[in-house]
Amino acid sequence: MRVLVLTKPFGDLPPEELADQLAEAGADGADLLVRDGQTVTPSTSWRIAETARALRAKGLETGLVSTDLTSADSEAERIIGHCAEAGVPLMRVGFYRYDAGLDYATCLDRARRDLAGLADLAARHGVRLVLALHHGTLHPSAAHASRLLDGREDVLVHPDPGNQAKEGSEDWRLTLDVLGGLGRVGCVGVKNAVWEPGAVRGSWNCRWQPLADGGVVPWATILPGLTGLGYTGPFSLHVHYPADDPLAAVRRDLGHLRGIRSEPTTTSPAR
């Protein structure tokens, strides 16, 4: 089980310090987020290679770089080029949003064209793109992502049951089946969430929850299930909830994740 850690909670730590933190937490590598306020920003994408070197020095991999890129432009050219230079195999693209002011078909057509251009650019550099199943986008579920991909085989998918819980849920087996099997999966996002009463009477809100504290996503079923089907790709652990001590939070959730993995396989109740 290869577990990458999304570097978001560590902010703008220098590469060497980030590598130290991830190694101390017990991660296998980084899901390196390229965003303002992070170790690597869009304007300092040359630091992808520097960060990858720092991680390698600690025995860690840069298994995935996560970006906000949605179309092929000069910024995308730089970031993808630096991913290739650093030997990063996968790059997560940004989020294609639904605009209620436009009709769905128009949004989908524009997103398809933008993704196609980005995928072609990545292919020229030898980098594989992954599309996350993410709430608040045109691709919150396997079915919606499949419509966006429109048969493209060069873009993999990044299932994320925690994110999918924000808009309901989707049986993880159905997700894989709709996508076309494990061969279409580049990485699996790991986090959990809870639904709780909101401030307005009768309303409910979904908030991120420490993985170690449980939540609405049945990881004790999903993880053994993926293993049983032969999934050998990476997992990306996300700590999106407020954490005063990111290292302690990551270490705790990572320990819980590995503990689930080592438990006997649980089966879903008969239907």
Ranges and model annotations:
Residues 43-50, 76-78, 104-116, 142-146, ...:
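Charged helix-capping and loop-helix junction motifs
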Residues 9-11, 34-36, 68-71, 95-99, ...:
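Active-site-proximal loop/turn and secondary-structure-junction residues that shape catalytic pockets
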Residues 3-7, 30-32, 62-67, 91-93, ...:
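Hydrophobic faces of well-ordered beta-strands that scaffold small-molecule active sites
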Residues 236-246:
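A short, acidic, flexible beta-alpha connecting loop/helix-capping segment that sits on the rim
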Residues 246-266:
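C-terminal helical cap(s) of enzyme catalytic domains, especially alpha/beta-barrels
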Residues 31-52, 99-102:
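Glycine-rich, proline-tolerant flexible connector loops at the mouths of alpha/beta enzymes
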Residues 16-20, 24, 57-61, 70-159, ...:
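Active-site acidic/histidine proton-transfer and metal-coordination neighborhood
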Residues 19, 120-216, 267-268:
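Acidic/histidine-rich catalytic cores of soluble enzymes
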